A protein has these predicted regions:
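Mobile genetic element proteins and their domesticated derivatives, centered on retroelements
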Residues: 3-5, 42, 68, 85, ...
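Acidic/histidine-rich, metal-coordinating catalytic segments
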Residues: 78-91, 117
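C-terminal anion-handling pockets and recognition modules
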Residues: 1, 118-150
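Short, solvent-exposed loop/turn segments at secondary-structure junctions
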Residues: 7-10, 45-49, 88-90, 112-115, ...
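RNase H-like polynucleotidyl transferase catalytic core
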Residues: 25-35, 100-118
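Short, aromatic/basic amphipathic alpha-helical patches
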Residues: 92-102
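Extended, low-complexity cationic-aromatic segments
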Residues: 1-69
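Short, basic/hydrophobic alpha-helical segments
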Residues: 63-81
Length: 150
């Protein structure tokens, strides 16, 4: 079974924790500026990330179907089960047709159930790593690639 998901990332990610004297509330200033966000998409199979793609545009059905057919499908063994969430661009019309044409099957996760998708933990770990180390990189793409290749 291969789990597929996408996540948004940005270079300037705010820390989740900080230090203050006991009893003193900690505040952090954040800019109101729009920050460039990139998206990451991949498959997760037996602890391995497959068909990792980092891109600077929004995901739509057409683009997702192209990535699915030309990047992910060629990496799968015949008869694989592909598990997807219910994102609007995961076309329930086209994706099953593409998967079945290559001998695969799609299972849909119930709505609002990220806890059933193990790749969500991969994204959480990636974002924790990026909060600590993305400042050392010129762009988010090189930071994400370095995270997955170290």
């Amino acid at each position: 079974m291969i789990y597929v998901d996408e996540s948004g990332v940005q270079k300037e990610m705010n820390p989740l924790r900080g230090r203050a004297k006991r009893g003193v509330r900690l505040y952090q200033e954040t800019s109101g500026k729009r920050i460039k966000r990139d998206n990451v998409i991949a498959g997760y199979l037996n602890g391995l990330i497959l068909a990792l793609c980092i891109f600077a545009w929004s995901t739509d059905t057409e683009w997702f179907c192209e990535w699915f057919e030309y990047s992910l499908i060629p990496l799968l063994k015949p008869g694989s089960v592909i598990i997807l969430d219910n994102a609007t661009f995961h076309s329930k019309v086209y994706l099953p047709v593409i998967a079945e044409a290559y001998g695969h099957k799609i299972l849909w996760l119930p709505k609002y159930s990220p806890d059933l998708n193990p790749i969500e933990h991969v994204w959480a770990n990636m974002k924790t790593w990026l909060r600590n180390y993305s400042k050392n990189y010129l762009n988010i793409k090189s930071a994400v690639l370095d995270h997955f290749h170290t």
